[in-house]
Swiss-Prot record:
This is Monogrin 1. Gene3D superfamilies: Pancreatic trypsin inhibitor Kunitz domain (4.10.410.10). It comes from Argas monolakensis (Mono lake bird tick). One of its GO terms (cellular component) is transport vesicle. Tick salivary platelet aggregation inhibitor that plays an important part in the anti-hemostatic strategy of ticks. Inhibits platelet aggregation induced by ADP (IC(50)~150 nM), collagen, and platelet activating factor (PAF). Acts by binding to platelet membrane glycoprotein IIb-IIIa (ITGA2B/ITGB3) in a metal ion dependent manner. Does not inhibit aggregation induced by ristocecin, an agonist that aggregates platelets independently from the glycoprotein IIb-IIIa (ITGA2B/ITGB3).
Length: 87
């Protein structure tokens, strides 16, 4: 629905990271991803986060939101704040 004015964005994560607190806050289990070379974390500031393997998947998800796209810096900030909340 183009009527959704929320913002959406993505963040590339390379390799495998052991920060399970941060990844749990984003609503997925990083271990399941088997530490592939690149994971794209995608979503809005307030909705559950999604982990995809390609940026195209993320673009498809973000198409539903008409707000300006989050920068990677902003996405990183969301990640840190959510990790604190669930930590």
């Amino acid at each position: 629905a183009k009527g959704d004015t929320r913002r959406c964005g993505y963040l590339m994560m390379r390799g495998c990271r052991g920060d399970t607190t941060a990844t749990r806050a984003w609503g997925f289990n990083y271990e399941e991803k088997k530490c592939q070379q690149e994971t794209v974390i995608c979503g809005t500031g307030g909705a559950p986060r999604n982990a995809f393997e390609t940026k195209q998947d993320c673009d498809a998800l973000c198409e539903g939101y008409s707000g300006p796209q989050y920068s990677m810096q902003e996405m990183l900030q969301h990640l840190k704040e959510n990790a604190k909340k669930t930590g």
